[in-house]
């Protein structure tokens, strides 16, 4: 989080890599995931969380079962109904179908949930950086956080960079740098910048 010396009033809970629908060496983890989501819902309620972050790999496969999707949507409905100030930000991971995850966005926005799976392009082919930005409000209704909501980046999602190094790594770096530059110009004195993303390095990490 990039901020000045003021205190951020938004309580954030970060999660990643749910992998709903996963079968682990033949073992169906549905019961485990149900227990986890019940625990998470209770944590959100007890700790009065204002923003839940899900940083990639919501599902284990790009074409999740109806049961896995039902578990996901029921959780979102439950926690946003139980917690009237809760906002949710979700970015796609490499296991998720970017388009499938983002497809119900208009419905999810009615439940204060923002999903970023696809890196959209403007008419001229430039990256739509506004789409990769999510505003989070405090309980007074003031925008306090500008989120860099960046999904897992595939070839063609990031700016082309002339480099003798790793073109993927440098392209990803350039996208984050350009997005940060735009948000830095946009932010006001009382707003912080929160980076949310998904990357693969020596290990898989939701940021």
Give residue ranges: language-model regions:
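N-terminal active-site segment of His-dependent metallophosphoesterases
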Residues: 3-77, 81-85
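Active-site neighborhood of phospho(di)ester-bond hydrolases with catalytic His/Asp-centered motifs
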Residues: 15-16, 52-56, 87-94, 116-119, ...
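Metal-dependent catalytic neighborhoods of phosphoester/phosphodiester hydrolases
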Residues: 25, 58-76, 92-111, 117, ...
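Cofactor- and metal-binding active-site motifs of prokaryotic enzymes
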Residues: 62, 82-83, 91, 129-134, ...
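Short, charged helix-to-loop "capping" segments that act as catalytic/coupling loops
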Residues: 79-88, 122-127
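His/Asp/Glu-rich metal-coordinating catalytic cores
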Residues: 96-207
